[in-house]
Amino acid sequence: IHLEMMGLATFNEKNIYYRDYIKSAIQMWLDAGVDALRVDTLKHMPIWFWQEFTTAMKAHKPGLFMFGEYGFSKPWEQRSVDYANNIGMSILDFGLCDGIRFCFSGQEPGGFHQVERVLNYDSVYQRANELVTFIDNHDMPRFLSIVPDSRKLDLALVLLTTLRGVPCLFYGTEQYLNNATNGGQDPYNRPMMESWDTSSHSFKLVQTLLDLRHRNQALSLGSHHTAWINDDFYLYTRNFRDSAVMVMVNKSEHDHIVDAENIQMPDGSYTCLITGFPVNISNGRLQGYRVHGNSAMVISAEGNPVEAPLVVVFQINGFETQPGQSIAIIGDCDELGHWDHAKAYRMEYVNQNTWTATVGFNRSCLLYTSPSPRDGDES
């Protein structure tokens, strides 16, 4: 035992016997069938320790998903960003959690601009789409304790499931579970489950949108494009390859009339997955469309995912492009153009720091590289 923190014993990570012990102990859980790890208090151990730990875990169980808690991290705080980018696992996105909670509680002004502020920092991360997002957890009052309105909770859940990141839902949130005693502070934020209602509006909403995440890669891999925003109304799209999702959220008590252009959705007639209302996009525009107060709308254009014996997700970070430029992959196989730049596989823009591509292969061994655009070149 090395130190004491918050009433808990901590250990000396410099001791190789401890490091070997903790790695072997967690590997036993993986062998028992555990398929993901949530790690506590990342920031109290050095980056090199987590690099060693995550390397050992992923070597033991390839494909393991890991994320950890860097308590109350913010994308404008460099130390937490360094952890997110260098420890080999994702982290909980406290910044976006705060943005969503401030948006609906009014604890800080700005409404949806609080959310947009956080998203504008996405390029500081190497894997923003892998940040684990949430709106409440065991270390803070539940959402309903600070915003006692189930309609607002439903709107927050729409954001949680359609914005970038991997959504993490606190138990009971889908049942409107809450105990506001003492402002919902610990231990009142951890009540026993009172309901298992699979017909509640919140349960069905979450079920619908999580099903959409499985079907539409724009939500798991795509870029974010804001088409309209003010304090009370938010219209954005998520886009990846030929897939797209459009989301409209109105947290005002009053209806909002939408007049928006440059919406990155294919033109066509859609049906909202939440309300069942029709939505028509023409020339990238939505004009004179009424969105009721305290409601959200989600429409989806589901493209064709890449299918092949082997599907590889490529990602490039750290290369900033200019408008009109793109990044592509070339390699020694048919799928990557046999080193011919004219036949290279073009990647998808996610943010200033991230380009992604899903490529299907008919074989499992290949050589590849990622060419950079030249000045004045369009590809």
What do the PLM-derived regions correspond to, one by one?
Residues 312-318:
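A short, amphipathic beta-strand motif
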Residues 273-285, 340-345:
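Solvent-exposed beta-strand/loop surfaces of large extracellular or lumenal domains
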Residues 24-27, 35-127, 131, 148-150, ...:
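Active-site-proximal helices and loops of the catalytic beta/alpha 8
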Residues 1-31:
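Chitinase-like catalytic core of GlcNAc-active glycosidases
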